[in-house]
C-alpha cells in the first residue's frame, strides 16, 4: 500500500437473493495523492448501483474530483451504472477534475464502446496509466 493510501470496503447485496451472482457488488476505495481509486467488484445494476453511487458521492463530498474507476473486477455494468457515472461527471468536471476508467475487461469495454462512452471518458489499460494521466494532461472539459 503506498504511503498515505487509505482503504474502505463496502458490500451491497440485492434484497431479492444474496445467492444471485448478478446482484452482488463490493466497492473498495483507495486514495493515492489527490486521486481517488474505486474498485467495483461484481455487477453494477439496478439492485447494486446505490453502493457505487455512494462511493462516488463520498469522494465528491470530500472535494476529491480526480477519480479512477478500476474495472478489473467489474463483471458487468448495466444502464444504472452508466447513469451513475453520467450523473456525477458534471460536478466532477465543473470542479476541474475528471473520472477515468482503467483495466476494462472485454465485456465491459464492449458495453462502453457500443454506447459511445469511450468518446466521453478516457480509458486506460492500467490503473497506473490512469493515475499518471492526471499529472500529464489537464482534466477533460
Residue ranges of predicted features:
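General small-molecule cofactor/ligand-binding pocket signal
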Residues: 30, 102, 124
Amino acid at each position: 500500500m503506498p504511503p498515505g493510501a487509505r482503504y474502505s470496503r463496502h458490500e451491497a447485496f440485492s434484497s431479492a437473493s444474496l445467492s444471485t451472482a448478478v446482484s452482488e457488488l463490493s466497492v473498495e476505495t483507495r486514495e493515492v495523492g489527490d486521486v481517488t481509486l474505486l474498485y467495483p467488484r461484481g455487477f453494477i445494476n439496478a439492485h447494486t448501483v446505490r453502493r457505487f453511487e455512494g462511493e462516488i458521492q463520498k469522494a465528491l463530498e470530500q472535494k476529491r474530483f480526480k477519480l479512477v474507476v478500476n474495472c478489473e473486477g467489474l463483471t458487468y455494468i448495466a444502464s444504472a451504472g452508466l447513469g451513475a457515472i453520467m450523473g456525477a461527471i458534471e460536478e466532477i468536471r465543473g470542479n476541474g477534475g475528471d473520472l477515468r476508467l482503467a483495466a476494462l475487461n472485454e465485456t465491459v469495454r464492449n458495453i462502453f464502446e457500443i454506447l459511445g462512452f469511450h468518446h466521453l471518458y478516457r480509458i486506460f489499460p492500467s490503473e497506473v496509466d490512469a493515475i499518471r494521466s492526471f499529472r500529464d494532461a489537464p482534466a477533460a472539459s
